Amino acid sequence: MDMRSGDREFPNGDFYSGEVKGIIPNGKGKYAWSDGTIYEGDWDEGKISGKGKLIWSSGAKYEGDFSGGYLHGFGTMTSPDESVYSGAWRMNVRHGLGRKEYCNSDLYDGLWKEGLQDGRGSYSWTNGNRYIGNWKKGKMCERGVMRWENGDLYDGFWLNGFRHGSGVYKFADGCLYYGTWSRGLKDGKGVFYPAGTKQPSLKKWCRSLEYDDTGKFVLSRSASVNVEELRSLNTVTQSLSVKTSAGETTCDPPRDFTCHGPVSKSARFSGSGQSEGQDKNRIVYEREYMQGVLIRETIMSSVDRSHKIKPPNRPREVRARSLMTFLRGEHNYYLMLNLQLGIRYTVGKITPVPRREVRASDFGKNARTKMFFPRDGSNFTPPHKSVDFSWKDYCPMVFRNLRQMFKLDAAEYMMSICGDDGLTEISSPGKSGSIFYLSHDDRFVIKTLKKSELQVLLRMLPKYYEHVGDHENTLITKFFGVHRITLKWGKKVRFVVMGNMFCTELKIHRRYDLKGSTQGRFTEKIKIQEKTTLKDLDLAYEFHMDKLLREALFKQIYLDCSFLESLNIIDYSLLLGLHFRAPGQLNDILEPPNAMSDQESVSSVDVGLTQEHSIPPKGLLLVTHEPNSVNTAPGPHIRGSTLRAFSVGEQEVDLILPGTARLRVQLGVNMPAQAHHKLIEDKEESATIELFEVYDVVVYMGIIDILQEYNTKKKVEHTCKSLQYDPMTISVTEPSTYSKRFVNFLHKVFPEER
């Protein structure tokens, strides 16, 4: 069809002038809508495509690439407020590399995704502050560096616009703080180096932040950085009688985008007096914070500290063992890929099978599924990037029913473990040499098993299934799958998938592994890090609970211990996680309540550590359970009824954390208590100042390590150690004694109110 030029005026007042193909705009042309919007540029069979310029009646204008009626390619958009974006577009939204200068002269230069900052980018504020690092959905996330106009600098991790995770804060005057943050507030242990003291290498620290113990930091979704969600432009219609989308949809509404303010001076310095005779250049402070409140401080020598300091959250070294050595590096990567492939295959195969009650044959030796996964794929398996491997799945029907019993959706289970975000290797808290992996959403822990542990698990599985089915509140480890991978060079690796007892958005400040024995049950202070799992002799608290909550707890502990005793199991322990709540009246003194403020919101306050503090007010509140009001669900591996509390008229209860969440209280999950600090004589800790004696805590717990039988080897170990130590103090002992000692010890940890 011949090309020709012409003008055409439409009944609604629109006007077109330019080249046409038949009656359709094609080539160069200009279209004016009746409201004043004008496009001039290339057309392709009735669609705006190619190079062009679009000016909306609102005053917004775009000049650049179009495709199929969309802003698509590279172009520059000037909004009515004079903010300018120049960069990549995809389907009417900013997507790719781009630079935006805001109307107040703030500047962002970096990657965009679906209209929001996402990826690497730099944001400069007009007041001189600047952030360089990662972004996610318009907010500062993951690794990034913030430098304030006053010279302060923070290098570390972020989440939803907050300082969150490991980081180092360097003050303009030379002071330095290494530690962890939670939603913009210091939370957990850290080290403060006054100006002039010997400080660890900042360069080395920054490199170490590339490695994190969990690989992610998942807490509150609340954010303080509010970047507008851009509304997509409507497509430019093919019909010439309908106008192009209005330009105002591309303009940014007034921005509410502020940066973190520098840490207040009151948060830097201790108010405790220093002896004039002390060498201030040698003194550093090991501090512990709780939601921004300083609760504990230890004065140390920088010389003593220099060889101890390790960046928080860096995986600690584990002594080499055959399995650990084998699974280093490339082999470990292949192993994770194989595990994900195998679980995807297993769940996909068993899910369509109609649900039924398990039979004796479902536990037997023939209850195994085997499959070979060649690299190039087969009729039953997909091609993959790992090495050839063989997969064995144990008792698939049993574990399918267990997953359903704990209300785990098959698709969500696969996505948690087999999703694109993958698995994260975490350091082992024990001496077993096992390797632990954490799912990307923290819901599941995967642990390597010894052959003997696998055999114990399979033998106990029928009774375990019965016990878990009869007791919905059991504290015993939840097992969701047992698998074996045989790599092409013959190495066999066995895995068990378990529920993560600490799957919570609350920060776990303390972790304890409690057995009730005392011989060797302590942690050397030089080895204690932010996420170290402590032991019996390290526990300096006793926990006071509501009467009915405590009764429910010990009722289940008795049942679980009796079950383990009947199976001849020993060496199990109570894994205890504690979330401390900060004393509310100090939040405004020791740490700025709004860490996102552009300027310091707190003046310098001299806070003395030696002054007396009254018992803090309750940071927790039990209220009658309201299913529709609970905004944070318990971990996905938890089932059972909501607990009742004596203090609320024996009603089912929720736990309110003021300003944080309303949580459903279940056995071992979200259980409130008061932690009473016990005074312990310890010369090494004479420089430690404990600010409070009573804390509100949220308790998480479960019974773990239940795969050790009291066999001949353990009997010999008990006999030998009994010759050296008091038999009641050593961990290894016969099952009935172990059970009684374990329960008696927990009675001391959770004493009955008098």
Swiss-Prot record:
A Pfam family the protein falls into: MORN
Single Gene Ontology MF annotation: ATP binding
PROSITE patterns: PIPK (PS51455)
Keywords: ATP-binding, Kinase, Nucleotide-binding, Repeat, Transferase
Cellular component annotations (GO), alphabetically ordered: membrane
A biological process term (GO) from this entry: phosphatidylinositol metabolic process
Classification via Gene3D superfamilies: 2-Layer Sandwich (3.30.810.10), Histone H3 K4-specific methyltransferase SET7/9 N-terminal domain (2.20.110.10), Phosphatidylinositol Phosphate Kinase II Beta (3.30.800.10)
Family matches, as InterPro entries: MORN (IPR003409), PIno-4-P-5_kinase_pln (IPR017163), PInositol-4-P-4/5-kinase_C_sf (IPR027483), PInositol-4-P-4/5-kinase_core (IPR002498), PInositol-4-P-5-kinase_N (IPR027484), PInositol-4/5-P-5/4-kinase (IPR023610)
Domain PIPK, chain residue ranges per copy: 329-750
UniProt keyword annotation of ATP-binding present: yes
EC number: 2.7.1.68
Ranges for the MORN repeats: 16-38, 39-61, 62-84, 85-107, 108-130, 131-153, 154-176, 177-198
Entries under SUPFAM superfamilies matching the protein: Histone H3 K4-specific methyltransferase SET7/9 N-terminal domain (SSF82185), SAICAR synthase-like (SSF56104)
Reaction(s) catalysed by this chain's protein: a 1,2-diacyl-sn-glycero-3-phospho-(1D-myo-inositol 4-phosphate) + ATP = a 1,2-diacyl-sn-glycero-3-phospho-(1D-myo-inositol-4,5-bisphosphate) + ADP + H(+)
Region (Activation loop): 710-731
Protein name: Phosphatidylinositol 4-phosphate 5-kinase 7
Annotated source species: Arabidopsis thaliana
Record gene name: PIP5K7
